[in-house]
Amino acid sequence: MRRDSDKYTQFGLVRDMLAATAIVERFDAQQALDTAEAIASVGRLLMTGEGSSRIFPAKNAIAHARRRGWKLELHTEAARQSQEYDLDGWAVFALSNSGRTREVIELFSKLQQRGHEQLYSLTAFANSKLESLANKGYVLAC
């Protein structure tokens, strides 16, 4: 695929994919060091969300961890299904572009009501409902 071909670059998805490299290069991993340490101390992480907000990032993280032999139990599941599970002793990381995904909000609301202390979020918008429910929220700055 040629980066300068209108045949492809007319589509937002293609433009986003082409921009991804620069975004990853600018990512400051130090900003999440405290979260990474907290998750490592728990030893188990569920990555949740709905659709493409969750599937690619979570499956990529799981594959990366397995290739490197990390001693961290990683799982991914849709937020609605995750509501059926006992998540005591798990860190839960919700991925939602809008930060308003209904199923994710319901899951985090229930976990927060139960006093769950390992709730993290990643959204594209600051001050979202999801971020307000998380113990620590991250906002994409791209």
PLM-predicted stretches and their roles:
Residues M1-D34, I39-A40, L119:
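Cofactor-/ligand-binding subdomain signature composed of acidic, glycine-rich
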Residues A40-C142:
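Glycine-rich phosphate-binding loops that contact phosphosugars or nucleotide phosphates
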